[in-house]
Amino acid sequence: MRPTPDLRCYFITGHGSHEHIVDVARRAVAGGARTVQVRSKPITARELYALTEAVALAVGETAHVLVDDRVDIALALRHRGLPVHGVHVGQDDLPVRDVRALLGEEAIIGLTTGTRELVEAANEHAEVLDYIGAGPFRPTPTKDSGRPPLGVEGYRELVELSRLPVVAIGDVTADDAPALADTGVAGLAVVRGLMESADPTGYARRLITGFGEGRQ
């Protein structure tokens, strides 16, 4: 039986030295982040392998650590017994059923979406997925998805349509947490807010508090 991830504060790593990224991950998890996706493009496979290993050793016993796109890296690190819990894949990556077959039933697998059509397509594979990411919430400099921003109201429709928990992504900040939580999303993915914060622990706590307020 695979674990149910806590997606409320979902940290996605950004650009920076490996030391800085690991430090931010550790501090974000101290503030309550319970899912960490290692994604620092552009990066070589070996660099991503080393970074994921470092993040997993730092926080993998407390938070679920996912690898962006690279199923092979997740497989290799899991084979070594490291606390790497799964992957997040995009629309152009391996088919999710093949990812599940490779990683096994206990791995966490997320998929990028952001339109009605993509959510409906994800619903067809709901039994092999754990959640979907949907965005962008607003335009973001960290990733150009080619999809129009959803805004707050765009999430209500996707949450209602989805058979899976939905994570909002795309320049989400802690200030957005109450309004986005009110739409029914399961969590908020944050890159810059945590990477650039002088206090990632406090930032994560503020986001989780705001998320709880939006759910009341």
UniProtKB/Swiss-Prot annotation:
Keywords in alphabetical order: Magnesium, Metal-binding, Thiamine biosynthesis, Transferase
Superkingdom of the source species: Bacteria
InterPro entries documented for this protein: Aldolase_TIM (IPR013785), ThiamineP_synth_sf (IPR036206), ThiamineP_synth_TenI (IPR022998), TMP_synthase (IPR034291)
EC number: 2.5.1.3
Classification via CDD domains: TMP_TenI
Pathway in which this enzyme or protein is active: Cofactor biosynthesis; thiamine diphosphate biosynthesis; thiamine phosphate from 4-amino-2-methyl-5-diphosphomethylpyrimidine and 4-methyl-5-(2-phosphoethyl)-thiazole: step 1/1
A GO cellular component annotation in the UniProt record: cytoplasm
Binding-site residues for 4-amino-2-methyl-5-(diphosphooxymethyl)pyrimidine, renumbered to this chain: Q37, V38, R39, S40, K41, D68, T112, K143
Co-factor binding comment: Binds 1 Mg(2+) ion per subunit.
Amino-acid positions noted as binding Mg(2+) in the UniProt annotation, renumbered to this chain: D69, D93
Binding of 2-[(2R,5Z)-2-carboxy-4-methylthiazol-5(2H)-ylidene]ethyl phosphate, residues: T140, P141, T142
One BP term from GO: thiamine diphosphate biosynthetic process
Cofactor(s) the record lists: Mg(2+)
Further remarks about this protein from its record: There is also a thiED fusion protein in this bacteria (AC Q8FTH8).
HAMAP family, per the entry: TMP_synthase
Name assigned to this protein: Thiamine-phosphate synthase
Species for this entry: Corynebacterium efficiens (strain DSM 44549 / YS-314 / AJ 12310 / JCM 11189 / NBRC 100395)
Gene from which the chain derives: thiE
